[in-house]
């Protein structure tokens, strides 16, 4: 194995046989050589350094054993930006990009007036949602909450690296806002919604390596949505726009929770690119 091409060919075959994604080999090789993709492709017949090959083999073996590529290389792209990730946070996913897209598209029909809007991202993890919203819309005053101190360190680092103005709070769901007497115009959350039953269906890469507390509530997957129904009235203004990421089987159940908790709420269930329920948007009025 003397050339970059031979190293890439070996790793692609090795990982495919192990049931991993073939393109993982290229991502790891880019990381271990420090090359841009165009440079890598132009250098396929060049020799690979001994140190680079050693690191590459070690990282390929790690991924074969189930460690996500994103945790090995320490990053993932979200909404066109590079976010730092480690095993203290979930890896940002395309489905969550769709949640952000829907929020940015639909909030205008709710808030026609000018001025700052108070946005709270609950369970921020890597900060992908909060940072993206702060950068995509200057009228948003963004706060982010997480119960994990380690996750908040990652989120804060991402905000600083990307130049996003986000205020971070450690606490359980909306608890920091409730205690501080703060109010929100928009609440967004991608809570742990995978049911205990569905956990068995996840790939071992996700199940054994991403933070369990950020994936599942250990029950039916609805625990945190139910808690939101109790907390939202304590932080909302005259109206609040709520956007949740949901499991693909949870659309009807979460919609029903909202309608039972808030009379007159306007609730929409939106599908993701795969045609599965993924986002709930709800406009809730205080006096209805």
Swiss-Prot record:
Domain of life: Bacteria
Originating organism: Bacillus subtilis (strain 168)
NCBIfam families: hemK_fam, RF_mod_PrmC
Protein name: Release factor glutamine methyltransferase
InterPro entries the UniProt entry points to: DNA_methylase_N6_adenine_CS, HemK-like, N5-glutamine_MTase, PrmC_N, RF_methyltr_PrmC, SAM-dependent_MTases_sf, Small_mtfrase_dom
Keyword S-adenosyl-L-methionine found: yes
Keywords: Methyltransferase, S-adenosyl-L-methionine, Transferase
Function (record text): Methylates the class 1 translation termination release factors RF1/PrfA and RF2/PrfB on the glutamine residue of the universally conserved GGQ motif.
Broad enzyme group: transferase
Catalytic activity: L-glutaminyl-[peptide chain release factor] + S-adenosyl-L-methionine = N(5)-methyl-L-glutaminyl-[peptide chain release factor] + S-adenosyl-L-homocysteine + H(+)
Binding annotation for substrate: 190-193
PANTHER family referenced in this protein's UniProt entry, alphabetically: HEMK METHYLTRANSFERASE, MTRF1L RELEASE FACTOR GLUTAMINE METHYLTRANSFERASE
Keyword Iron-sulfur: no
GO biological process, one term: methylation
GO molecular function: nucleic acid binding; protein-(glutamine-N5) methyltransferase activity; protein-glutamine N-methyltransferase activity
Binding site for S-adenosyl-L-methionine: 123-127, 146, 190
Pfam family, one: MTS
EC number: 2.1.1.297
Family: Belongs to the protein N5-glutamine methyltransferase family. PrmC subfamily.
């Amino acid at each position: 194995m003397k050339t970059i091409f031979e190293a890439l060919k070996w790793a692609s075959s090795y990982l495919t046989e192990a049931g991993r994604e073939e393109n993982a080999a290229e991502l790891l090789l880019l990381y271990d050589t420090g090359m841009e993709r165009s440079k890598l492709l132009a250098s396929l017949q060049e020799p690979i350094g001994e140190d680079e090959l050693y690191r590459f083999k070690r990282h390929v073996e790690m991924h074969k054993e189930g460690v996500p590529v994103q945790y090995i290389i320490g990053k993932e792209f979200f909404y066109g930006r590079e976010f730092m990730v480690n095993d203290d946070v979930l890896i940002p996913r395309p489905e969550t990009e769709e949640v952000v897209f829907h929020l940015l598209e639909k909030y205008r029909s709710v808030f026609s007036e000018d001025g700052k809007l108070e946005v709270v991202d609950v369970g921020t993890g890597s900060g992908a949602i909060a940072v993206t919203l702060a950068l995509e819309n200057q009228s948003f005053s963004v706060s982010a909450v997480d119960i994990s101190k380690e996750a908040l360190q990652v989120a804060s680092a991402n905000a600083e690296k990307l130049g996003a103005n986000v205020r971070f709070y450690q606490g359980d769901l909306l608890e920091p806002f409730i205690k501080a007497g703060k109010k929100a115009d928009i609440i967004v959350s991608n809570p742990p919604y995978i049911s205990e039953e569905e956990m068995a269906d996840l790939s071992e890469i996700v199940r054994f390596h991403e933070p369990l507390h950020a994936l599942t509530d250990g029950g039916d997957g609805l625990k945190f949505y139910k808690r939101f129904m109790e907390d939202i009235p304590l932080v909302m203004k005259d109206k609040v726009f709520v956007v949740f990421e949901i499991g693909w089987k949870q659309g009807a159940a979460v919609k029903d929770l909202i309608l039972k908790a808030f009379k007159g709420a306007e609730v929409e269930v939106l599908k993701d690119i795969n045609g599965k329920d993924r986002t709930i948007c709800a406009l809730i009025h205080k006096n209805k």
